[in-house]
């Protein structure tokens, strides 16, 4: 049976929970789309998060890796198109690290594109009635760090395994403490992940539909 690795993060920036992990953990050891799903919680820490990710990849030998992270302020499931080779932390990570303008991989490419069918995932989510869009930036914090590190590692291993990153909004419980911020219920995020797992396994070539942005 094929394996899909789904990662999420521990809470950060004073939050009591991270909705990415709340949504991901319930999928651990479940069968979705004919594949076994394994879940891994990453530290919200530069470098350490990649060490944990690489160990999980080595242990589980997945066919697909989907990394998930919280992005408070996002209004929908944001499927990331690209990761850039820079750390520029507006806040410190969970161990007090705050790198500014440092490369994730010395002499690595400026960017990597997701190897998941990004637009097909968005299309499938919308068909399922779940708000979704293509995102053109994963930021410059630990989420982008993990996405770039993931894609670099998979490229070094011959691009046999496909991977990418997805940002999700606050949970309603978090949004209650951040008045005016959008949110998405955790069960809906979990349902979205199931849709994306199935689509990622079923489709390797992306669809040619618009997903660009003006700014």
Curated annotation (Swiss-Prot):
Function comment: Removes 5-oxoproline from various penultimate amino acid residues except L-proline.
Entry GO MF terms: pyroglutamyl-peptidase activity
UniProt record similarity statement: Belongs to the peptidase C15 family.
Cited CDD domains: Peptidase_C15 (cd00501)
Classification via PROSITE patterns: PYRASE_CYS, PYRASE_GLU
Catalyses which reaction(s): Release of an N-terminal pyroglutamyl group from a polypeptide, the second amino acid generally not being Pro
Protein's gene: pcp
Name of this chain's protein: Pyrrolidone-carboxylate peptidase
Signal sequence interval, chain numbering: none
Pfam family, one: Peptidase_C15
Gene Ontology process terms (BP): proteolysis
InterPro entries to which the protein is assigned, alphabetical: Peptidase_C15 (IPR000816), Peptidase_C15-like (IPR016125), Peptidase_C15-like_sf (IPR036440), PGP-I_bact-type (IPR029762), PGPEP1_Cys_AS (IPR033694), PGPEP1_Glu_AS (IPR033693)
Subunit structure: Homotetramer.
Keyword annotations from UniProtKB, A to Z: Cytoplasm, Hydrolase, Protease, Thiol protease
Family annotation (NCBIfam families): PRK13197.1 (NF009676), pyro_pdase (TIGR00504)
Key word Hydrolase present: yes
EC number: 3.4.19.3
Active-site residues (renumbered): 80, 143, 167
């Amino acid at each position: 049976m094929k394996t899909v690795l789904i990662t999420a993060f521990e809470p950060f920036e004073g939050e009591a929970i991270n909705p990415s992990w709340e949504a991901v953990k319930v999928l651990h050891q479940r069968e979705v789309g004919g594949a076994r799903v394994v879940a891994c919680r990453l530290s919200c820490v530069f470098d350490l998060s990649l060490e944990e990710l690489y160990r999980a990849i080595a242990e589980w030998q997945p066919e697909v890796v989907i990394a998930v992270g919280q992005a408070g302020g996002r209004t929908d499931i944001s499927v990331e198109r690209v990761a850039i080779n820079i750390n520029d932390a507006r806040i410190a990570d969970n161990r007090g690290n705050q790198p500014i303008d440092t490369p994730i991989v010395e002499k690595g490419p400026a960017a990597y594109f997701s190897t998941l069918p990004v637009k097909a995932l968005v299309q499938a989510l919308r068909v399922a009635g779940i708000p979704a869009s293509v995102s053109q930036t994963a930021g410059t914090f630990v989420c982008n760090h993990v996405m770039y590190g993931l894609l670099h590692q998979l490229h070094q291993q011959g691009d046999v395994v496909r991977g990418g990153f997805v940002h999700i909004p606050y949970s309603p419980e978090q949004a209650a403490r951040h008045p005016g911020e959008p949110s998405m219920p955790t069960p809906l995020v979990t349902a979205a992940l199931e849709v994306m797992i199935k689509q990622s396994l079923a489709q390797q070539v992306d669809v040619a539909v618009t997903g660009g942005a003006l700014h």
